[in-house]
Amino acid sequence: MEAENIRADAFEPAKRATKRGASGGGQQDVEMQVDEATGIEGQVLGSSRASAPPKAKRARSELRKVSVPPHRYSSLKEHWMKIFTPVVEHMKLQIRFNMKARQVELRVGPETPDIANLQRGADFVRAFLCGFEVDDALALLRLEDLFVESFEIKDVKTLRGDHQSRAIGRLAGKGGRTKFTIENVTKTRIVLADSKIHILGSYQNIQLARRAVCNLILGSPPSKVYGNLRAVASRLSERM
């Protein structure tokens, strides 16, 4: 067999395939916004999406069920229209309260623009049932990357009887002043439900608020916690 002549100058360097996804084009600037109605900070809705969301598929399996605790029945009935209106008109979801199962059920409708609205609607209802005001929980529908983190006092330190009551008192402060200060500095919302604590906000802000709450539970004086919070908040504002 005759050897075939190979021209070395005819070869071109191989092209490296570009990676798809968020890591391919470097870091993207995330636009943060403080909701004027609630003061909660989060990512601007739609700022992380490169294109318009696809039309949601109509499927009966796309359903979310949120159990209603017994002590929130009356509050749910009282504020039902405030919950129903944004979920149906803005999220374009179908919602109902199943009286027999004691659950709020949400389902994708024919006009739902984004399948992610179903999870956000369920998070909104779940936040209200945790004890947040409707206006505060609405931030979950207005802004992206907001979460509700829940934990108990015993997760931080085992306290019983009067010791636990004093810890709850330190968290609230006189007239709720300590809780309001932590909320304003960290741009979050906090609910003290007996021994359970719920924090609504962005991931970074939740960590700040949780650190302050844990320090108070462990016995740190409020003045020291305020100082640490303001120092961290000022450093974060300089970075932004």
Swiss-Prot record:
Among the entry's GO cellular component annotations, what is one?
Answer: nucleus
Entry annotated with the keyword RNA-binding: yes
**Where does the record place the KH domain?**
164-213
Its signal peptide is none
* Ranges of biased composition (kind: Basic and acidic residues): 1-15
GO terms for MF:
RNA binding
Region described as Disordered: spans on this chain: 1-61
Protein keywords: Nucleus, RNA-binding
Where is the protein found, in the record's own terms? Nucleus, Nucleolus
Alphabetized InterPro entries for the sequence:
KH-I_PNO1_first (IPR055212), KH_dom (IPR004087), KH_dom_type_1_sf (IPR036612), KH_PNO1_2nd (IPR055211)
**Which SUPFAM superfamilies does this UniProt record tie to the protein?**
Eukaryotic type KH-domain (KH-domain type I) (SSF54791)
Which Pfam family, giving just one, matches this sequence? KH_PNO1_2nd
Q: Coiled coil: which residue ranges?
A: none
Q: What family does this chain come from, according to its entry?
A: Belongs to the PNO1 family.
What is the name attached to this protein's record? RNA-binding protein pno1
